[in-house]
């Protein structure tokens, strides 16, 4: 009887732990969906959609834009990028999350406007903080010297 009770308690503990883990990963899925939507909007060059994905008080930190603040300013920066690289595309390689943070590794490809014979390829990693389905912080890292 003691063995049956021990097995029952073990199974109960496992079920409770598994339920808690599943509930915690639901936030990860929602956060990852928000970031996936940002990449889909980027590849469509849809700056209006990008503006809606970022929270109104969002911040973006990157080598070229160390302190962008607000979803409108962030979207305007993407509009400028789409103008400078008309065929810009983000090729997502890795997407992972932990709580409200999403980690993305991707490669930006395209050609600078007027230089169709010179392709660019930039490896990038971004750390996004997502709250209530919106990106509130974007810390992006890349080598500015890569052609």
Labelled PLM ranges:
Residues 24-30, 34-36, 40-44, 59-61, ...:
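A beta-strand edge to alpha-helix "cap/lid" segment located at domain peripheries
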Residues 7-17:
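Bacterial N-terminal signal peptides
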Residues 1-7:
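Positively charged n-region of N-terminal signal peptides that target proteins for export
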Residues 18-24:
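Signal peptide processing junction and immediate N-terminal pro/mature segment
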Residues 67-68:
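Acidic-and-aromatic substrate-binding clefts and catalytic sites of carbohydrate-active enzymes
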Residues 52-53, 84:
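Conserved catalytic core of Hanks-type protein kinase domains
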Residues 53, 57-63:
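Acidic/histidine-rich, surface-exposed loop or edge segments in extracytoplasmic proteins
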